[in-house]
Amino acid sequence: MAENSLLGKLDGLVSRFEEVGTLITDPAVIADMKRFVKLNKEYRDLEKIVGARSEYVKVLNGIEEAKALLESEQDPEMREMAREELDTCNERIPALEEEIKLLLVPADPQDDKNAIVEIRGGTGGDEAALFAGDLYRMYVKYCELKGWKISVSSFSEGSSGGFKEIIFTVSGEKVYGTLKYESGVHRVQRVPATETQGRVHTSAATVAVLPEADEFDVEINEGEIKWDTFRSGGAGGQNVNKVESGVRLRYVWKNPITGVSEEILIECTETRDQPKNKERALTRLRSFIYDKEHQKYLDDIASKRKTMVSTGDRSAKIRTYNYPQGRITDHRINYTIYNLSAFMDGEIQDCLDHLIVAENAERLKESEL
């Protein structure tokens, strides 16, 4: 086989793949959970690259064999078969090379994590809260389509419905890597139910998507956490307002980016079981701190890119939902969909796919492979 620069980049990774495969069966490594999880993720990532390399080598060999057959074979039928094989293999090469190049570009290390999603009504008062509720229902339906699990941590209802704020966790495969594109300001243009003149109003809601931190991702001195309990409201029953199942934690933490100490306040009324609420409040605390550290990673990426798809900038207007025209426009990629009702029913994958393609193009361009 002729010298191939792309294969040269992969040779060392094959050796590392074999090394990691041995390490994750070592009892000493298995006993070190933090190291084991890290190596397991590296193994899965390398497995994809090694698999793509094997297919690439197979196609390159097919090209060499077809060329050799054309040079040596006199039978017309055999020569025609060789030409067809050569054409087929040559057609596959560009896609395989792009796949390998993309796999070689470091992805966001948090993509495989679960996500904590926060939706807050912004400008627009009651209408903004109603729109925040619409976004929540949209994500619920999308998660149902994906087979993901949603667990609401806390919420504050709007006076006319919807939510002033709702925070929930989404669990499943590559949740953060998919939902991270939803971070930002979502703007809605429609006639509110309370509008008597039929005028179109503009409101907004903010979505923040955080990677859920694992226990060993962040070091927290649990002895410094101040806990309070309170009676949580609910739909009814004997437990309501009689058992202090709601929990509130306060934790003083030094922000590594600003260097300033700040108090983090988190409440959880997710279940009627106080220990479970404590556990989930701790998870949110870890995720909050982890997100701040992850934001530095995103800022570093943003400083290197001229165009950005998923920078994590939660103040950027990312999408407009225009009800009179039945359209949604994603401003990051200037992509418009004319099926708003289906979109609000959770059919958002097409838009996400376009965002993923745009970001992959950015990653390939900046990698200079």
Swiss-Prot record:
Q: Which UniProt keywords apply?
A: Cytoplasm, Methylation, Protein biosynthesis
Asked if the Swiss-Prot or TrEMBL record annotates the protein with the keyword ATP-binding, the reply is: no
Superkingdom? Bacteria
For this protein, the parts annotated as crossing the membrane are: none
Question: GO molecular function, one example?
Answer: translation release factor activity, codon specific
Q: Does the keyword Cytoplasm apply?
A: yes
Q: Where in the sequence is N5-methylglutamine found? A: 238
Task: Return the GO cellular component terms, semicolon-separated.
Answer: cytoplasm
What PTM annotation applies here? Answer: Methylated by PrmC. Methylation increases the termination efficiency of RF1.
| Coarse class of the protein's main subcellular location | cytoplasm
As given in the record, the signal peptide range reads: none
> What is the protein's known function?
Peptide chain release factor 1 directs the termination of translation in response to the peptide chain termination codons UAG and UAA.
Instruction: Please report which protein family the annotation says this sequence is part of.
Output: Belongs to the prokaryotic/mitochondrial release factor family.
| Identification of the protein by name | Peptide chain release factor 1
